[in-house]
């Protein structure tokens, strides 16, 4: 219910207040209102819901911020997508390539194409390096470089992983935790890529063959909303509001989230018409943990740890080009160090309805940066000029063919996995769970996990189950805990929610569960203890 106080601020009282209208926040809001709970969602963006999964529109052109395939092994997630957006999915072919030294490589690699492009001598070096690391692997795997070198060999790692990865994260690969590699490319290896490339080259590859073993990059098609991922989240917002139980307050930033000392919450949101006060029995936050810590009252004891969490930011420069489509790919990965762009999207390849003019090609150049650095603070005009220049360097288009451009910035797009992130996250998680059991953290930034859209949704789904049950039935932090990339195997293959342990684990049970992780979570700065042979190979 909405009221206006004597001081002029708006006041609401709801069952649940939600910070952030991204996939996690809107999933929670949709399921809660469907169950009859009253909900208020605050979103600091004045125009768009969906967070990093939003779709931005500019003069009729639609831009997907980062590219979002709709695939999940969770049948509950698939069913929810279909429930929210029943009639607007299209099936799209998947095509991505790597650009390296002026040549394009299919991704996944095609064996014969890679041999032709790399040449016999370099290909032989790649295979020799791969065999060396299979015979003498790095035993103490701590960094992205260690993990990927063990999987592919040093030579192939340096060609196809190092440059692009360092563009994405802005740090050397040997300083980056192995978590990212384990999550995003687990299940792939040089041998697997070669075998799959041979099958593809000979026409023997099967699409989603039901084995549940296909790794993420081997999927051939995907579903996609015809007007971009934002179409899904616009629909979720509209359904929340249509119930009469939910409100989505746009342009409202989190000012303070205060505990009332009795398990309830008082949230202050700063909006275009002043402040809004929302009281609620439960609070769900998808805000970055670092940001949440400074706005909680009383302040958490772990605020310092939260302040040390880091993020990688992101911007897209969309160019409208008078041309046929420049390439058929959904996107191409730019491994060339001569340009700053990391990836180039072809928006029409995602959906023809994203580009209104058939005579115009529309692409998005993706740049990875830190908020406040030279790229982030550059003017839109400068960024558009840089994008035109780099497209020319790559040989994809001439600057004079560009007829329009737009820039979209996304802060805190990626939570950074550095040496201390795991202990910082765990410290804050443990404190909040003990002190504030009615405060629930969900989503990518809410949990500081580099999760996909369906993972973010699942954390919200589990949280809603807990709220409706009145107790913690499920452990939301177990979602994707094994660092296995979720987009693998058959869509909808998993049909049940993971059950939470109801008893405390014994010490040896906890140790056994911890042993399933193949790589440590943080970079270990201990002295190099590898044997002499391993050091020579490295």
PLM ranges: what are they?
Residues 1-13:
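A short, basic/flexible loop-to-alpha-helix module at the beginning of a structural domain
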Residues 6, 419-538:
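C-terminal lid/capping helical subdomain adjacent to the catalytic/cofactor pocket in oxidative enzymes
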Residues 14-41:
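N-terminal Rossmann-like FAD-binding beta1-loop-alpha1 element of flavoenzymes
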Residues 33-57:
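Glycine-rich FAD pyrophosphate-binding loop
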